[in-house]
Structure formats: structure tokens, C-alpha cells
Amino acid sequence: MKIPAWISAVFAAIGAALLPACDAVNLPEIKPGITTAAEVRSRMGNPAYEFGNDDGSVTWEYNRQPNGTSCYMITIGSDQIVRTMEQVLTPANLGKIRDGMSRDEVRRLIGGPGSKAVFDNLGEDIWEWRIAGVTPMEETYFIVHFDLASGGVKKTSQRVATKG
């Protein structure tokens, strides 16, 4: 028996609405120096991406894109204990993105985008993140424009969309 599309859409919307609530419960329980990698996986699930670090630690990306406005990077030491936890979609981190940075460098800094689009006529690969906005009636997006020829950052921009 096939489930009607509208029922699937309702369950997807409920899941998206509950995800931030899960973060509100789970994130305060993750404590650097105490929480184990197994506990993080149990509470948060599998990370969207894992970055290996030179010192043997690993950083796990817990991204809430495209609907959320946060991305948590949790660094696990070689002893399997949480070292740090940081919400990386911040004005300070967005300001660190510079011309020429690679896609990997950008992802490492602020996590994976909520959407991607290639504009051949502009020679750009566009990555977009939903970020915290000024008012609840607006959605704010941070955009990184990568040059298709070089692969590096060409520029950054923002756009604001009114909800409703």
C-alpha cells in the first residue's frame, strides 16, 4: 500500500519541527571533558561529516540545514572524549571566509550548505546557508560564490526573504 504524498509531507514537517527541540534537550548534556563519543552518537545520531585533525582527534559536523540556522562542530579526542563543541554559523566565522578559499576550507569552517546551485553563465557554484536573522518574520541566508574555473571563493553575499 502506498502512503499518500501529503501524509509523507506532514511527517517530514513534524520531524523538521522537532529537530531543534531535540537539540535543546541533547546539546546541554554534551560536556567537553566528560561526554564520550558513543554518548554523542547516541544522543545526536551520526554526524553529517567527519573531519580528521592532525593531532588524531576528529571533528563531527551536526548540521541543521536547510531548515535550521545552526551547525555544531563537536571535536572528539583520540581518547574518545569530547574536547569542544561549537555552533559555527556565527557572524565571526562567516567573516573569516576569504577570496580563494576552497570548498573544503569553507565546509570545515561553517559546515555544509543547505543548498547548492551551479550557474554556468556566471561561472559560479553557489552554496547557501540559512542563518539567524534579525526578525522572526524574515529568513536570512548567507551565500558563498565559488568560481567554477579556480574552485575558490569569488565573493560572499546575503539575502533576506520575508516569511509568509
Q: What are these language model-derived features?
A:
Residues C22-G164:
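Residues within mature, well-folded domains
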Residues M1-P20:
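Sec-dependent bacterial lipoprotein signal peptides
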